[in-house]
């Protein structure tokens, strides 16, 4: 039997040879994200990976592809007293809204600014940059409707990738209005597309009645003439949405953020209102969006709270790391942690002394390791080199009798004898 990871899921592994799947690259991206989010005043919230399906039906939208085609549902046990259908989270926002409401975070000083990161799951058609198990960096702001906040979350994401040296990004923005002005736009779309339904795909025909905005999001019919001539939402905005839209563009300009207006961006979730945006990189081809998001001023009310504005984004970690690899941007990962000390022992008498030294080194805050395979000294030295150790402490039976050890500086290639009780202080002086 061949045992392998399910299709569309990836192992994240220790080692530069694994490219974008190198776990150290993931750690650095997470660290940079946390640092930038905290600079912006965001705090971490860790929601569960599983939520009740009802949350996504009401929050994300019953007719969205995520709910109808892509969710990994969990069938409850027959003897489960709480036998409601659950699902692995397909995105973060709905679960973070649920956590904000359930735990009374609305009682804290507002707005609430939170970040989260971790895995999410969708039954996707697997291709470059699109997986069934994927990871997101997520930020959300609850309780502020100022368009300056929309601009802030866009800037936050750009600051994260700027620290990684990533350039050549395109910020695409649009406004899809609100429940007051969207019905008029919805009707305009239906009037426009109705004569062409026989030429459009099955999904478009389904969306025509249930959610005509999603017609603009169709990939199969993207080049159809009716798509290119469709009404644009910006022509149908109410006064409030137009002021918000103009405010967003003003703030982006003030921040020096270049942007393009793309009236076909509607995003694939029903909860969006007003601002929607995507940040693109051409190296990913069809999956060129590294991250996207927008405003969802009605979502919290839909989930059961009081009317509360919200805005945020989800950034695809796999996509960011894949682009960094394709661009050859390795500098952010150059400070890969090294093993401080490898303890090489030779002979039975040296073994317990080496183990005692190993634990003393670790207690002193130095990363340290020792051979557990009974290898020769030559093989131990070779292994220490592969581990990129800074120093090797060599202990043989003669050294033990003399109360000393040989300390080899691996970068310099020098070696000297040091009393055992001075090993730690010697290594600290060498690093000073």
Swiss-Prot record:
GO molecular function list: ATP binding; catalytic activity, acting on a protein; histidine-tRNA ligase activity; transferase activity
Subcellular location: Cytoplasm
Matching PROSITE patterns: AA_TRNA_LIGASE_II
Reactions that this protein is recorded to catalyse: tRNA(His) + L-histidine + ATP = L-histidyl-tRNA(His) + AMP + diphosphate + H(+)
Annotated Gene Ontology cellular component terms: cytoplasm
UniProt KW keywords: Aminoacyl-tRNA synthetase, ATP-binding, Cytoplasm, Ligase, Nucleotide-binding, Protein biosynthesis
Gene Ontology biological process terms, A to Z: histidyl-tRNA aminoacylation
EC number: 6.1.1.21
UniProt keyword annotation of Aminoacyl-tRNA synthetase present: yes
UniProt entry tagged with the keyword Transferase: no
Pfam family, one: tRNA-synt_His
Top-tier EC class: ligase
Family: Belongs to the class-II aminoacyl-tRNA synthetase family.
Self-association state and partner proteins as the record states: Homodimer.
Protein name in UniProt: Histidine--tRNA ligase
Species annotation: Symbiobacterium thermophilum (strain DSM 24528 / JCM 14929 / IAM 14863 / T)
């Amino acid at each position: 039997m061949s045992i392998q990871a399910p299709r569309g899921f990836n192992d994240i592994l220790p080692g530069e040879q694994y490219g974008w799947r190198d776990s150290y690259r993931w750690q650095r991206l997470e660290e940079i994200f946390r640092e930038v989010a905290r600079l912006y005043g965001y705090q971490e919230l860790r929601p569960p990976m599983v939520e009740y399906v009802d949350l996504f039906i009401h929050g994300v939208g019953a007719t969205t592809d995520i709910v109808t085609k892509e969710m990994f549902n969990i069938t409850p046990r027959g003897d489960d007293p709480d036998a409601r259908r659950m699902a692995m989270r397909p995105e973060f926002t709905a679960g973070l809204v649920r956590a904000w409401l359930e735990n009374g975070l609305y009682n804290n000083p507002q707005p609430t600014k939170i970040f989260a990161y971790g895995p999410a799951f969708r039954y996707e058609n697997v291709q470059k940059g699109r997986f069934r198990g994927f990871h997101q960096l997520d930020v959300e702001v609850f309780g502020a409707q100022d368009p300056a906040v929309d601009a802030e979350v866009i800037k936050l994401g750009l600051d994260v990738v700027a620290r990684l040296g990533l350039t050549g990004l395109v910020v695409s923005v649009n406004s899809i209005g609100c429940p007051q002005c969207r019905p008029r736009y919805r009707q305009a779309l239906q009037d426009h597309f109705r004569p062409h339904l026989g030429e459009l795909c099955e999904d478009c025909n389904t969306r025509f009645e249930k959610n005509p905005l999603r017609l603009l999001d169709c990939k199969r019919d993207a080049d159809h003439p009716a798509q290119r001539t469709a009404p644009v939402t910006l022509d149908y905005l109410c006064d409030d949405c137009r002021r918000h839209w103009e405010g967003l563009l003003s703030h982006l300009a003030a921040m020096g953020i270049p942007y393009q207006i793309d009236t076909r961006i509607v995003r694939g979730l029903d909860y969006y209102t007003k601002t929607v945006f995507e940040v693109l990189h051409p190296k990913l081809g069809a999956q060129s969006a590294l991250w996207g998001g927008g405003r969802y001023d009605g979502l919290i009310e839909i989930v059961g709270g009081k009317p509360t504005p919200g805005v945020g984004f989800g950034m695809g970690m796999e996509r960011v790391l894949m682009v960094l690899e394709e661009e050859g941007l390795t500098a952010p990962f150059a400070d890969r942690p090294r093993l401080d000390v490898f303890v090489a022992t030779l002979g039975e008498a040296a073994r317990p002394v080496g183990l005692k030294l190993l634990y003393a080194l670790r207690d002193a805050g130095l990363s340290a390791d020792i051979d557990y395979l009974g290898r020769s000294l030559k093989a131990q030295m070779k292994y220490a080199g592969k581990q990129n150790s800074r120093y090797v402490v060599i202990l043989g039976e003669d050294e033990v009798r003399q109360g000393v050890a040989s300390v080899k500086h691996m970068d310099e290639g020098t070696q000297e004898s040091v009393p055992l009780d001075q090993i730690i202080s010697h290594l600290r002086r060498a690093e000073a």
